[in-house]
């Protein structure tokens, strides 16, 4: 006799099947294998990689310490960072030889102190001297982009409720005195910041919570025009500008930094040059997508989206704060993003991204590795390549 499932069973079965499909590679891709290695248990939320001692090997810098490569066991103290509740006041790790002495320095800043600083690499073991770049107000996090195309990055902190300011290293300085010029491009902006060419004129624009700021032909002397295309709340830093569907128009990928959701906004331009945006969901089921990167981590020539949860971004106060912690990469399959899980589980088992992370080939095996900090510790996910 025919067998009929109750409707409730059908619903459960279909839901499980859908999740299974989303988590698997499509027919044109194979999953990557990652080996997780715990580096430290401190709860600094930012990390980057650089060759600190100029021995040709990449080291890891996070918070008050740097870890010597290639094994990252030996660590060196950099200096103190103030702590406020669960937070260390250290929300970026931008690598930049600020004073031109050949040693890679680090730029950071924090919410509580409201100060953008650069930490001077002594070139050897010992404390890194801290220099003030600007007192700019509460810093959510900071990013760097080469806005004028001169080969030197500018520094752009996200300071919600405060002016949006670009900090440019002043040229022709000696090592003893280093100053940054400040260029205000907006009187006030909110949570979220991105950079990329929206209108196809070859210049990078700034993306903020209320729209995008069009870069003029003289970015440090002419006004930036706001196009109020968006109305975002607690958007990610960065918001990524990339041509997702390869139609010749750049789109924007935006995470919800303190809520559920990861989306991409498809740019469309009609014959009258009117610009509209169509919102597409990438992952509506996870929360606190505070930071993200694009990188080719499977060596197929196409960029993947790498992101995950900023664990305890607002302590216990965000939607999804008590959900499992995850790190993922998403691959465009021609129609949508396919999700691959790198790490997922309860705190201590799953691992998130923190607020600033790095992707580099640490062990010279031609596969890019992922280095993530956070309130759930400092880890490296060594990329072992495609599963066979």
Regions found by a protein language model. Give the residues of each.
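Beta-propeller-forming repeat regions
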Residues: 23-388
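Bacterial Sec-dependent N-terminal signal peptides
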Residues: 1-26
């Amino acid at each position: 006799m025919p067998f009929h499932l109750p409707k409730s069973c059908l619903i459960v079965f279909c839901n499980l099947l859908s999740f299974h499909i989303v988590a698997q590679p499509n027919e044109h891709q194979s999953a990557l294998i990652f080996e997780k290695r715990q580096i430290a248990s401190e709860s600094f939320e930012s990390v980057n990689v650089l060759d600190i001692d100029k021995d040709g090997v990449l080291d890891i810098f996070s918070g008050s310490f740097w870890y010597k490569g290639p094994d990252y066991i030996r660590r060196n103290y950099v200096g103190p960072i103030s702590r406020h509740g669960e937070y260390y006041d250290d929300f970026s790790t931008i690598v930049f030889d600020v004073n031109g002495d050949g040693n890679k320095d680090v730029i950071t800043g924090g919410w509580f102190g409201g100060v953008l600083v650069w930490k001077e690499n002594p070139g050897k073991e010992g404390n890194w001297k801290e220099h003030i770049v600007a007192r700019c107000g509460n810093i959510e996090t900071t990013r760097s982009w080469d806005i004028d195309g001169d080969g030197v990055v500018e520094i752009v902190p996200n300071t919600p409720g405060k002016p949006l300011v670009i900090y440019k290293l002043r040229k022709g300085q000696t090592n003893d005195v280093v100053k940054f010029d400040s260029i205000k491009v907006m009187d006030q902006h909110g949570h979220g910041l991105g950079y990329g060419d929206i209108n196809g004129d070859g210049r990078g624009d700034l993306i903020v919570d209320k729209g995008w700021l069009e870069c003029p032909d003289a970015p440090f002397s002419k006004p930036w025009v706001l196009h109020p295309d968006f109305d975002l709340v607690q958007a990610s830093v960065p918001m990524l500008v990339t041509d997702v569907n390869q139609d010749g128009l750049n789109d924007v990928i935006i995470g919800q930094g303190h809520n559920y959701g990861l989306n991409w906004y498809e740019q469309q331009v009609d014959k009258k040059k009117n610009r509209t945006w169509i919102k597409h969901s990438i992952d509506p089921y996870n929360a606190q997508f505070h930071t993200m990167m694009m990188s080719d981590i499977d060596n197929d020539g196409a960029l993947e989206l790498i992101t995950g949860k900023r664990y305890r971004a607002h302590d216990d106060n965000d939607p999804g704060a008590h959900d499992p912690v995850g790190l993922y990469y998403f691959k465009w399959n021609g129609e949508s993003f396919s999700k691959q899980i790198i790490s997922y589980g309860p705190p201590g088992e799953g691992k998130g991204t923190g607020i600033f992370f790095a992707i580099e080939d640490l062990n010279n095996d031609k596969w890019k590795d992922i280095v993530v900090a956070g309130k759930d510790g400092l880890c490296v996910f060594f990329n072992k390549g495609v599963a066979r």
